[in-house]
């Protein structure tokens, strides 16, 4: 019978015994079988280890002390990339094993194992790559048990070469000898390859015609090309667009060709040491930058030593370090190079990762392609993170982190959460775990919709998933909602959730909170139960129900979503709502009088209380952004302006209504802003006072709700909390008033995190029935 791990001690394992050990978790593709082999042979144990669709199964036969040492090491010192979730130990009759062997993988009835994320090249492989005496010198696919691609090349489990895109590359005799040698770091490493037998790079022109195939020649040519040209480079999870970040011409050309006037580009640099010559890097940021996950990290600039067009008007810039041999070669003998390294995508779509798609869709943007002949099976954008008060937060959770599982209270059925339509990630729940997908971008195009369907199908295959319940957003126009309806037509149960409730439920689920919280959801939009556009929500919520307790007052959104790209229209609406004369505002906008008439006659002017839209409108009033080209551009510029006057501590006390749901007086706030402008107060000071006013009223409303509902826990979520000033001031204010404050840590606070909340609501609603 199974024996719980904690009960297995030296006293319970007898001399010459046989135990079956079933290990579940991230245990395939991480060197787990070679690790067990070394343990067993080192402790004179006989038996076997095998990958199967349930994880790893070990049979150990030997004396009690030796087996105990093996079990302790499996639990306490697994391989670096492994994550053990469960160990089940069963005592069996002696089998009479004569050796310890690694068996061929099995397919069993249930797929109950996890797939490791892609990680950066390890130090040992890095050193071999640059060692001229090593047979992998300058071989760009150098990898081992502890590093390199995993998720992006796996087509199915169990994890073997035949179920990865390495199946097209039979190992040469030298690689096969390493693969079969238990003492070698590449023992049973499925992506194992070298220049004789492995994948190869090639340099192509913009039409896809091959120019070069020899790697060192390619690298020399690419380094030269990047000075004056835009190059698409195939990386681990898709293509990057790259160019010299110091070149005004190149960066401007990239913006023109990609139709990306403002949105900042990420850069890649050679090292922390070089980065510190122009940025302030905290210890926590260094840790993230150098981690095996290698995310992009938003770092504070001290001085600009590259083109001002890389991240115009912004204090923080996205930075990453090399994570593949190819990328390290870009900086070889050129340590002070700075390259733009941005996802090759079209207007917020997912990253392009198929070669044919790259040649077809990027040829008008790039001058050259650097590609290779190994297929990317699962695309992954670079993850993006930032640090506030030494706590790391996700903007985008993808490469390096997906598809690592999150653990939850057990669900009785398979649940699919479709996520939102912006910054989409979906989620699958089965048993006691959730797999949140990689970043899929915005689902507003046929390309995005098609990839969404394909990615769900891929996840369903590799995780043996068939949804019995689908949870979606309640917005009737979302693609994800329509997708849920399609499944409903095939007999699958569906539940629709309110957007901001899902935001808060996600935080509750992540932190294991079962009691109601004061949930504060600040974002750009979300379909409300009253059919208006919410976005400044104070909810008394758990993972089944919510009560709307407070919000900012409504104002009109002239032209609906078209106003989002024209913040001046929102600013004009705020003036109209307050009765302030708009004659001195937006005088250069040709449509001004037409928009005023639309507002006055209430033609296509949906109501919103969104904090995100309020930020847009205030940025427009201060003259910072009349028109924008990317989401949150106006809000980012308003935050940047506020940073110039961060030392200003004046707090405007926004009035709050007396009855629930409490109304926060937006009109009063706009009047105060215009009054300060009339007095000649600097825009930076007004911007900072606006931030402090939002933080102050947030804390005051939370205090009112604590008094009324006797709740001391606050959950914060929504994309507006990417604002560093607002997050810091609100968290600081709440903690000073002895609230327990919870924020998303394992997922983004934006819509990339709501699928987990949808899972929690779906599970607990189903269990309640």
Feature-to-residue mapping (PLM):
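A contiguous, well-structured pocket-lining segment that forms one wall/lid of small-molecule binding clefts
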Residues: 191, 198-200, 420-458, 573-711, ...
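A phosphate-binding glycine/aspartate-rich beta-alpha loop in the early core of alpha/beta enzymes
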Residues: 91, 230, 238-301
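Conserved phosphate-binding/catalytic loops in two-lobed NTP-binding clefts
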Residues: 473, 491-503, 712-717, 724, ...
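Intrinsically disordered, low-complexity, mixed-charge
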Residues: 4-7, 12-191, 195, 202
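Glycine-rich phosphate-binding/hydrolytic loop that grips phosphoryl groups
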Residues: 500-522, 526-528, 567-576, 742-769
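Short glycine-rich phosphate-binding loop at a beta-alpha junction
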Residues: 232, 464-476, 709-720
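Conserved phosphate-binding catalytic cores of ATP/NTP-utilizing and phosphoryl-transfer enzymes
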Residues: 276-281, 329, 351-358, 382-383, ...
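Internal gly/pro-rich beta-alpha loop/helix module
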Residues: 163, 178, 334-409, 608
